[in-house]
Curated annotation (Swiss-Prot):
Protein name: Oligoribonuclease, mitochondrial
Gene: REXO2
GO terms under cellular component: cytoplasm; focal adhesion; mitochondrial intermembrane space; mitochondrial matrix; mitochondrion; nucleolus; nucleus
Domain Exonuclease: 43-207
Record: active site: 194
């Protein structure tokens, strides 16, 4: 049995040490949990340019990716890659694709690229693994269901990392056009550059518009405005 004074000092020391580390551990654990929950709310924005929309024969020729938080703030810009495809496939594209991909310089860039589809998937998968937890963050974009079809087929490991749900800005657009036609007239118009990174940036800006002008304000924001208005009325009176 420990002697009184020595024992009490040792016990106090052990207890104090554990108490301090225990509290710090709780704080660090809480911070880690909050960070994990925050990361789970992120959105994985993707845009593809393809040789066409036929999933049986067409291929991905450009892909870009951005990560935003739940408030649509851009947190990270991922790879923006042009993927090599055979000239025969490019020559068989529709007139629309030949015109727009030719005008944007994408066709020429594809011919000059040395990046394979497998290399591209590895780059994008590495990026989203660094930025998002597995299986929790949804794919986001404009008419992103079309992109998803190609990603499911050609980049299955990338898609396996994401949540099965998607956030499609075009759905919000169509609802806004029907339910809020006056506000819809002020929605940002797409420049139609038909380049992946530009299209993602436009999609994020468009959803920001709908959020700010169509979706109702958060309760806390409403309360703040009510308080501010009340203070202003007191000042005026």
């Amino acid at each position: 049995m420990l002697g009184g004074s020595l024992g009490s000092r040792l016990l106090r020391g052990v207890g104090g040490s554990h108490g301090r580390f225990g509290a710090r551990g709780v704080r660090e654990g809480g911070a880690a949990m909050a960070a994990g929950e925050s990361m789970a709310q992120r959105m994985v924005w993707v845009d593809l340019e393809m040789t066409g929309l036929d999933i049986e024969k067409d291929q991905i020729i450009e892909m870009a990716c951005l990560i935003t938080d739940s408030d649509l703030n851009i947190l990270a810009e991922g790879p923006n890659l042009i993927i090599k495809q055979p000239d025969e496939l490019l020559d068989s594209m529709s007139d629309w694709c030949k015109e727009h991909h030719g005008k944007s310089g994408l066709t020429k860039a594809v011919k000059e690229s040395t990046i394979t589809l497998q290399q591209a998937e590895y780059e994008f998968l590495s990026f989203v693994r660094q930025q998002t937890p597995p299986g929790l963050c949804p794919l986001a974009g404009n008419s992103v269901h079309e992109d998803k079809k190609f990603l499911d087929k050609y980049m299955p490991q990338f898609m396996k990392h994401l949540h099965y749900r998607i956030i499609d800005v075009s759905t919000v657009k169509e609802l806004c056009r029907r339910w809020y036609p006056e506000e819809y007239e002020f929605a940002p118009k797409k420049a139609a550059s038909h380049r992946a990174l530009d299209d993602i940036s436009e999609s994020i800006k468009e959803l920001q518009f709908y959020r700010n002008n169509i979706f109702k304000k958060k309760i806390d924001e409403k309360k703040r405005k009510i308080i501010e208005n009340g203070e202003n009325e007191k000042t005026v009176s």
